[in-house]
A protein has these predicted regions:
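Conserved, mostly hydrophobic/aromatic
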Residues: 1
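Hydrophobic face of amphipathic alpha-helices that form TPR/SEL1-like repeat modules
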Residues: 7, 11-129, 147, 559-564, ...
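Glycine-rich loop-to-alpha-helix module at the N-terminal edge of alpha/beta enzyme cores
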Residues: 111, 115, 121-214, 501, ...
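Short, well-ordered beta-strand elements within core beta-sheets of diverse protein domains
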Residues: 114, 127-132, 148-153, 337-340, ...
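Residue-level signal for inorganic ion chemistry
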Residues: 124, 130, 145, 160, ...
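Extended, hydrophobic alpha-helical segments in both membrane/secreted and soluble proteins
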Residues: 163-164, 178, 182, 186, ...
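Substrate-binding/gating loop at the entrance of the active-site cleft, primarily
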Residues: 218-271, 587, 594-597, 601-628, ...
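ALDH superfamily catalytic-core signature
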Residues: 273, 278, 300-301, 305, ...
Length: 727
């Protein structure tokens, strides 16, 4: 198409071309000028990345640049992969490595150890064994973290920034080993493991950089919270735990990392990068435990904040067992792509299969639902192409670098096995096929005719199965997606600008994607985190500008004279009012924006002062978040607060507890509130913002918004007609 239409191309003029005309001379001149360049144009490839070479360290910087992934098309990098396999693919003759338990600066080998078998070798080869802590050892780990004998909390942000950059460089040096460990222990393909290492490096460089904007605020004091517990998942065993520990360490906290047991050797490996870079072993401890000892960790008074990436039920259990400890959790997702009649079907299919089957469908952001407008749904050609795309993906052992889909982490996923049964009206476009003896490797599977309410429509599965639903129009698709309990990622495949705007305005999810895949969020480019039951905490995204502020205590300096009214207005206009794209990639827009909350309630207690209430009311109004104010009978605030324009309600605590479910978020003037409030909030999955209000708007206004990332691929096979506005 470009050849026939572009003004510089020969075919544009060839039909009416005559010698001696202006067009003839234009084309002749083009040719002659091009010919003159033949001896000066370089023949050296521009793609020169070579993973066989020693990693080039990156010095500390004030602006983070994302780490490049590996270019696997290059011969030298393919040789590098073969070297990884030679080292990490163990044989039955190899003795498994024994990983000790770390307690501060000491290590001990425990009798109780978890064995890690290579699922790509039919569980017949043991890769390593890792020591598990008992409850007594967990108590020692907690004591060390609380006392901070190495003085990590006394370090400056600049010192921590330098150390985190050094850790990032160490991670870059061990990229091959991290990938090999993920292949052997978790069954990740080389490509999927590679992007994880890049993401972990990005986190190490980004979070201390992002902390500087808060450290430079003139009228606030920032202090570490104390000990942060990071509980990380098996499906991203490298990037996500690195993100959690750096977020904690960046603020001067000591960190205890409890990785998913089935993926923990990866954490032991990358922890060495941080220790070698200068993080004291007393400040970063890695531990795996049994269920009983884990409860000691999650309920310990020494732990001041918990960072979790895992299942929604896990987050609920932790919150309900320890409701007063702040929890920041990225949890489940039942993620959908909507394809309308206005979508590019071929391009959509490419995005759909990559999103559904990458990492064997085990990403929390994976597409497990495809909602297709009827005219496309009933198109036999579309069905054939989708089937062909799914069945064309290479599936099998990760030790074959050509395989795109590898094994699942477990062969005992009861939810997935149940979804592999058909309900009434359903059929298989691509039937399920297990390709190995122990049923770890499931080929991409596509279920057709799934109806809203069916098991596979509403259940998060963590496997390479896509459920296809017929819809009548986009609005119906939006309504169905919004009816789900989750709101992590969501996608639209449509070239219609009106449909894009409607979907963007109405869909309830944290990360939105238009005309591209819905997985693979990149640090600072697409800050990541969901809504509804896909997130617990303050609605602040990992890999975004505000994440690290969650894990420090920020207070007004004594005697602060900041005019909070001016500060709130200024902060809103400069930071919160407008969407922005900090990367400005040509061809893909990545907008980051703040949304007001549906509603919010401020609960006042007799010890709270009215000035704090006025600050909260002003902040909510500036952020366009409707606020109600509730107070105890006998503590009448009507006269003092009537001018704020907020609904005022005098009610006993029991009545307030019953009404909490009606608000998206609860606000208080401090953390010293009745335990019943914490318990009820945990029971109904609500977040209480308990930080004492501060006068600086850049800090305070975070409590009254939620964050959303929108990634929009606006080029058409490399051609760009118009760059859309960021909104």
């Amino acid at each position: 198409m470009d050849e026939n239409t572009a003004p510089d191309n020969f075919l544009t003029h060839s039909f009416n071309l005559k010698p001696g005309t202006d067009t003839w001379r234009f084309l002749q001149n083009q040719f002659e000028e091009a010919y003159k360049m033949k001896d000066v144009i370089t023949h050296i490839p521009t793609r020169t990345q070579n993973r066989l070479h020693r990693y080039t360290p990156v010095p500390p910087a004030d602006v983070m640049k994302n780490e490049p992934d590996t270019d696997f098309d290059l011969a030298q990098n393919q040789e590098w992969v073969r070297n990884i396999f030679a080292k990490w693919k163990k044989s039955p003759a190899d003795s498994p490595e024994i990983i000790p338990l770390q307690i501060g600066a000491e290590t001990v080998v425990c009798e109780k150890r978890h064995k890690y078998m290579d699922r790509c070798q039919d569980d017949e080869v043991c890769v390593c064994e890792m020591s598990q802590a008992d409850a007594g050892q967990v108590m020692k780990i907690l004591e060390i973290a609380e006392k901070d004998p190495a003085g990590w909390r006394k370090t400056t942000l600049q010192e921590r920034h330098k150390i985190m950059y050094e850790a990032a460089n160490r991670l870059g040096e061990m990229r091959g080993d991290l990938i090999g460990c993920m292949c052997a222990v978790t069954g990740k393909t080389v490509v999927e493991g590679d992007v994880e290492v890049s993401e972990g490096i990005d986190y190490a460089r980004f979070y201390t950089t992002s902390m500087k904007q808060f450290a430079e605020l003139p009228d606030v004091d920032i202090a570490p919270k104390g000990t942060i517990l990071v509980i990380s998942p098996w499906n991203f065993p490298c990037a996500i735990p690195i993100g959690g520990i750096v977020a904690g360490l960046a603020g001067g906290n000591t960190v205890i990392l409890k990785p998913a047991t089935v993926a923990a050797p990866v954490a032991w490996l990358f922890a060495k990068a941080f220790w070698d870079a200068g993080v004291p072993k007393e400040a970063l401890q890695v531990v795996i435990t049994d269920r009983e000892a884990l409860k000691v960790l999650t309920t310990a008074p020494a732990v001041k904040h918990i960072i979790l990436t895992g299942g929604t039920d896990t987050a609920q259990n932790i919150a309900r067992s320890n409701p007063a400890t702040p929890l920041s959790a990225e949890t489940g997702g039942k993620n959908a792509i909507i394809l309308t009649a206005s979508g590019d079907r071929d391009h959509a299919i490419m995005n759909i299969v990559a999103s559904a089957f990458g990492n064997a469908g085990q990403k929390c952001s994976a597409c497990s639902l495809l909602l297709v407008e009827r005219s496309v749904y009933e198109d036999k050609n579309f069905q054939d192409k989708l089937k062909d795309a799914a069945t064309s993906m290479k599936v099998g052992s990760v030790w074959n670098p050509g395989n795109v889909v590898g094994p699942m982490i477990t062969n005992k996923n009861d939810k997935l096995l149940k979804a592999l049964e058909l309900e009434k009206g359903e059929s298989w476009l691509v039937p399920p096929r297990f390709l190995d003896k122990h049923k770890y490797v499931l080929a991409p599977t596509v279920k057709w005719g799934v109806r809203p309410g069916n098991y596979s429509f509403r259940t998060e599965l963590f496997g390479p199965m896509l459920s296809v639903v017929c819809i009548e129009n986009l609005q119906q698709g939006i309504d169905l997606v919004n009816s789900l309990e989750y709101g992590l990622t969501s996608g639209l495949q449509s070239l219609d600008e009106g449909e894009q705007k409607l979907w963007k305005d109405l869909i309830m999810a944290g990360n939105l994607y238009i005309n591209r895949g819905i997985t693979g969020a990149i640090v600072n480019r697409q800050p990541f985190g969901g809504m509804k039951l896909s997130a617990f905490g303050g609605g602040v995204k990992a890999g975004g500008p505000n994440y690290c502020a969650c894990f420090v205590n920020i207070a007004d300096k004594p005697g602060s004279t900041t005019d909070y009214t001016q500060s709130y207005v200024k902060a809103y206009e400069q930071e919160f009012a407008h969407a922005r794209d900090v990367n400005n990639l040509y061809g893909e827009q990545n907008a980051f924006r703040y949304l007001p909350l549906k509603n919010m309630v401020l609960r006042l207690f007799p010890g709270d002062n009215n000035e704090d209430a006025k600050m909260i009311a002003l902040a909510a109004r500036i952020c366009h978040t409707p606020l109600s104010i509730s107070f105890e009978p006998g503590d009448d605030r009507t006269a003092a607060l009537a001018s704020l324009g907020c609904p005022l309600k005098e009610e006993a605590l029991a009545g307030f507890l019953k009404s909490m479910k009606n608000y998206e978020r609860i606000r208080t003037c401090g953390a010293d509130i009745p335990m019943e409030m914490y318990e009820e909030a945990a029971r109904i999955d609500k977040y209480i913002a308990t930080a004492k209000p501060v006068k600086d708007g850049r800090v305070e206004l975070i409590h009254y918004i939620k964050e959303q990332s929108i990634s929009f691929e606006y080029h058409r096979y490399g051609s760009i007609l118009e760059v859309p506005p960021v909104e």
